[in-house]
């Protein structure tokens, strides 16, 4: 009996307590200064890639998001993996047959950076229907980290969300709801190539504004009003309020199109009928009414 082991392991992952020192203005200023150092090129499809197209990136990004969701990865893993993918594609031409291998490798490395128990190479190969082997993934990992010069601690929009929420004089229950919705918007933005041109702080601020706008939360001090929040966050990230507003509108448009696409995938017959109706409307009307032209 005296040699029995006492097992105290628990299934839940232990996390550090929130540290207010990590959310002060000095840290945020340093993050805003550093965010551009790990930004991908906005024109790599034109200048670097010969086979890979934006539509292919979208397919791989959607697959990566599904894998991360099914494996219940930390929220930061997917945006960080997409940062690696875009930065690698900014530097190195990739054959379209190797794009899924690159996506799996990016998740593999991002998971090591952010997870307590990272994804294994074998598990990621299973998600590719065993079209790649663990040895290939490990070789690609070496190529990836070398091309990125081992600069793997890239800033993502998730790193900024907590800073913004800490500065908002709101109840914790409201912040929890805003945080969850903003994280969803960040993941959605990572799947769309149009958001590569926006810095992480802008995407994070736009996601918070879009979350508040969509949730329609009531605030006793009216801080959550659209105008006040936009002005406040634009001052925090030192950008023009109109730029932040444009980013937020882009996010809402992306959400709308994604919901529409999901609905069409669930009901293809309804989608066909909708397309037929749109064609009939297009045929029935003229492109521009001359009475609307101001001469």
Curated annotation (Swiss-Prot):
Residues 272-282 have a biased composition (Acidic residues). SMART domains: CYCLIN, Cyclin_C. The modification Phosphothreonine is found at residue 286. Its main location: nucleus. InterPro entries: Cyclin, Cyclin-like_dom, Cyclin-like_sf, Cyclin_C-dom, Cyclin_N, Cyclins_cyclin-box. Residues 28-152 form the Cyclin N-terminal domain. It is found in: Nucleus; Cytoplasm; Nucleus membrane. One of its GO terms (cellular component) is nucleus. PANTHER family: CYCLINS. Belongs to the cyclin family. Cyclin D subfamily. Regulatory component of the cyclin D1-CDK4 (DC) complex that phosphorylates and inhibits members of the retinoblastoma (RB) protein family including RB1 and regulates the cell-cycle during G(1)/S transition. Phosphorylation of RB1 allows dissociation of the transcription factor E2F from the RB/E2F complex and the subsequent transcription of E2F target genes which are responsible for the progression through the G(1) phase. Hypophosphorylates RB1 in early G(1) phase. Cyclin D-CDK4 complexes are major integrators of various mitogenenic and antimitogenic signals. This is G1/S-specific cyclin-D1. It comes from Pongo abelii (Sumatran orangutan). The lineage of its organism: Eukaryota, Metazoa, Chordata, Craniata, Vertebrata.
